[in-house]
Amino acid sequence: MAEEADLLGQDSDGDSEEVILTPAELIDRLEQAWMNEKFAPELLENKSEIVECVMEQLEHMEENLKRAKKGDLKVSIHQMEMERIRFVLSSYLRCRLMKIEKFFPHTLEKEKTRREEEPPILSPEELVFAKEFLANTETYLKDTALKHMPPNLQKVDLLRTVPKPDLDAYVFLRVKERQENILVEPENDEQRDYVIDLEEGSQHLMRYRTVAPLVASGAIQLI
């Protein structure tokens, strides 16, 4: 994995900018996305560019291994590293698919109503999957139950019947960049709002809703 990876990011003005990552930095980005996706209660912004770059790097590694001497200890080490990367990548993608299936109407609605300058939640492939899952669910409900009900009961609002992600769930996090004046909202009427600072390297247990913007910006890492 000697090749560098090119990622397209966005600057503060919303314009695309190219980010050059070393292979080690690329895998670190993948692992961060994997951990955040595993522990966040909602579906996060898709990282399709990271996924594509990692897959390209795996192809380069396979080509390099084909040219390496058989029996070389380095070959075995690289093969184990490739399997580890494949595991992280497949686990990340499976986690996203599970969330899409679990929250599909809410995910599609959020994707539909997001502003143009906001990053997409779903990759093009995930969007197709979510729409097909929605259509198949509606067809199944209609064929197995709804068509046998009175006309006034033959419609179902999936946004109301399918549970939403629990944004008030508590998550463990590690602070990557110091944050000041984080507003913590009360959990009941007897409490008041208060403000805290999050020191770099510190770990906390907090409500996801409070730190969701920091997860999106990369300022904190879910653990």
From Swiss-Prot:
Primary localization: nucleus
The UniProt record lists the keyword Ribosomal protein: no
Modified-residue entries (Phosphoserine), positions: S12, S16
Membrane-spanning residues: none
Annotated spans, Important for GINS complex assembly: 166-223
Modified residues (N-acetylmethionine): M1
Source superkingdom: Eukaryota
Residue runs in coiled coils: none
Example GO biological process: DNA-templated DNA replication
Compartmental location: Nucleus; Chromosome
UniProt xrefs under SUPFAM superfamilies: GINS helical bundle-like, PriA/YqbF domain
Pfam families found in the cross-reference section: Sld5, SLD5_C
Gene3D superfamilies hit by this protein: 1.20.58.1030, 3.40.5.60
One GO cellular component term noted in the UniProt record for this chain: CMG complex
InterPro entries per the UniProt record, alphabetical: GINS_A, GINS_bundle-like_dom_sf, GINS_Sld5, SLD5_C, Sld5_GINS_A
Keywords: Acetylation, Chromosome, DNA replication, Nucleus, Phosphoprotein
Family: Belongs to the GINS4/SLD5 family.
Protein function: Required for initiation of chromosomal DNA replication. Core component of CDC45-MCM-GINS (CMG) helicase, the molecular machine that unwinds template DNA during replication, and around which the replisome is built.
Known partners and oligomeric status: Component of the CMG helicase complex, a hexameric ring of related MCM2-7 subunits stabilized by CDC45 and the tetrameric GINS complex. Associated with ORC2. Interacts with HELB.
This protein's name: DNA replication complex GINS protein SLD5
Species whose genome carries this gene: Bos taurus
